[in-house]
Curated annotation (Swiss-Prot):
S-layer protein. The S-layer is a paracrystalline mono-layered assembly of proteins which coat the surface of the cell. Residues 1-28 form the signal peptide. This is S-layer protein. The keyword RNA-binding does not apply.
Length: 558
């Protein structure tokens, strides 16, 4: 049975470990050809700190061992990736870069095996996890759970199309890392574009017909009905970065997000130094009794250059912000057994983002809270006691002028984060649409701080002469041999498996560029310019055990 990439979830760039690749201590006899130094291969696999290849495994490979080998090679490539930053006064400015595309839809062929009808509306959806976007799909209209007020012309949508995942969009696998809410829930990003085949103006995107969302889902769930309450202190993705929900302010109809700096416990009277002259102090904790229940009030201060610039005294939980610089979310407080002093459990954030509901967050994009109202998705701009417990996420909706006359070569920008592109691939019979990301995210880190962005985690451990920081990019570089052609490849290729398991390897053997059969030893071969001008590295052998030996040898020497 042919495999799909979704089933091979382990094949991703992830440098945390090299899976089982280093488990074997047995020296293998491996035949090499086409290169004299493994450094040559490393330069082919990674360029400027980024993956420069695809790892290709056979869709009909008879052995899962080839899949494991491909996963281990991909993981090793991930461990070789890095980012550079400039160092100044104990901090580093870093940039994380990512590129990825969603699946595509041909407007001239894929609408019920025909062209998209005149005046029809289609909603295209992609997400950081394809399981989320899949649940939006509907061949006969808008998503079944979506209220008409979520998008303009939602009641006119004729078809909702799932374009799968954009691998470099952000997903958070644990929104509650400190177990404030005893939750292992997830959060992911979703983008939507509603496109009309307007006979007078070509393809058109109207006002209110694009949406970006970040939603909190119950652990391992993907239906919108199973989204769950977004709480203060939770981590959610927002435009490619993992951020803290600092405050959900009913009085101000605003949601504050921030970059987490410290998550833990501070003793009464102590301070935490954020750098740049900022400190957070727990000045006092006072216990009172209300209806035979202990209630703890916390006096929390934000200081700048030693002066108090913001202060709040209230019962926990409580929130405090100062400008766009610092946010404090106190979850709970308590005293020691003797009642001598207290402790506050909190998260401190910097670089705050204030999303004022029904106001522009950036030009042409307004912010809203997303509600799960008994299974129905709604947007809300007026938070109150009756609906705040239904808030499951944040939305930014396009509020600019219509974008018309769209055709091949055009692209629609979504928050300077994702683009929606049209491409006829130089054919009059095609017009494909898809989502695409080519994005940089910048961050400034002090020693010991980390940031998660575009599915990469960067931690600044120390300041060196050159701030080169390894990163673990989780955007997949794996492909099936049914998805890659030697004639059209746009990157170097690592082919895992012999001619029986991998059809691209077979093509090279049939063309006389590689000698490999069922009796061949473990082999690592470099074949320059064999894939549309790109280099090919073959990791294979006469059987699956020999292929495994070759994979382990490659990993050991990179």
């Amino acid at each position: 049975m042919a495999m799909s990439l979704k089933k091979i979830g382990a094949i991703a760039v992830g440098g945390a470990m090299v899976a089982t690749a280093l488990a074997s201590g047995v020296a293998a006899e491996v035949t090499t050809s086409g290169f004299s130094d493994y450094k040559e291969l490393k330069d082919i696999l990674v360029k400027d700190g980024q993956p420069n290849c695809y790892v290709v495994v056979g869709a009909d490979a008879p052995s899962t061992m080839d899949v494991v080998s491909a996963a281990d090679i991909a993981a090793k490539i991930g461990s070789l990736c890095y980012k550079e930053g400039t160092v100044e006064d104990g901090s580093a400015d870093i940039t994380v870069h990512a590129e990825a595309n969603s699946d595509d839809f041909d407007l001239k062929k894929d609408w019920n095996n025909s062209a998209m009808p005149a005046n029809a509306y289609a909603l295209f959806v992609a997400a950081s996890d394809g399981d989320y976007s899949e649940k939006f799909e509907n061949d006969t209209g808008k998503p079944s759970f979506m209220d008409n007020g979520v998008l303009g012309d939602a009641d006119k949508i004729n078809k909702t199309v799932d374009l799968g995942d954009i691998a470099t969009m952000m997903k958070v696998d644990d929104v509650d890392p400190s177990d404030w809410y005893d939750s292992d829930d997830d959060a992911g990003e979703i983008v939507m574009v509603e496109l009309k085949n307007d006979t007078s103006d070509g393809f058109t995107v109207y006002k209110k017909n694009m949406l970006y969302e970040t939603l909190v889902y119950k652990d391992d769930e993907e239906n919108f009905a199973n989204t769950t309450k977004m709480e203060e202190g939770m981590r959610i993705p927002f435009l490619g970065k993992e951020m803290v929900v600092v405050d959900i302010d009913k009085d101000d109809d605003a949601i504050y997000l921030g970059t987490p700096v410290y998550d833990g416990i501070i003793k009464e009277g102590e301070t935490y130094d954020l750098g740049n002259g900022y400190q957070v102090k727990i000045k006092a904790i006072l216990k009172t009794t209300v209806n035979n229940t202990d209630v703890y009030k916390v006096d929390v201060q934000i200081l700048k250059d030693g002066k108090v610039v913001a202060e709040k005294y209230d019962k926990a939980p409580l929130e405090l912000e100062y400008k766009d610089d610092v946010g404090v979310t106190v979850h709970k407080a308590w005293e020691n057994v003797g009642g001598d002093y207290g402790y506050a459990e909190l998260v401190i954030s910097k670089d705050l983002k204030k999303l004022e509901l029904d106001e522009e967050y950036v030009t042409d994009w307004k912010a809203y809270a997303v509600l799960n109202d008994n299974g129905t998705m709604k947007l809300e701009d007026d938070l109150n006691d009756n609906n705040v417990d239904k808030v499951v996420g944040i939305a930014l909706r396009y509020d600019g002028d219509k974008l018309d006359d769209l055709d091949s070569g055009d692209e629609v920008d979504i928050l300077d984060y994702v683009k929606f592109k049209l491409d006829d691939e130089d054919s009059n019979d095609k017009l494909k649409v898809y989502f695409s990301m080519d994005k940089d995210v910048d961050a400034t880190l002090n020693i010991g701080e980390k940031v998660k962005a575009l599915n990469a985690e960067v931690k600044l451990k120390d300041i060196k002469a050159n701030a080169v920081e390894p990163v673990s990019l989780t955007a997949p570089i794996a492909k099936l041999d049914t998805e890659v052609s030697l004639d059209t490849a746009d990157k170097n290729l690592v082919l895992v498996g012999g001619p029986v398991a991998n059809k691209l390897t077979k093509e090279l053997v049939d063309a006389g560029k590689l000698a490999l059969d069922n009796n061949s030893p473990a082999t690592i071969a470099l074949i320059p310019d064999a894939a549309n001008g790109h280099d090919v590295i073959v990791v294979a052998g006469g059987d699956r055990e020999k292929t495994r030996e070759a994979a382990l040898e490659l990993i050991k020497n990179l």
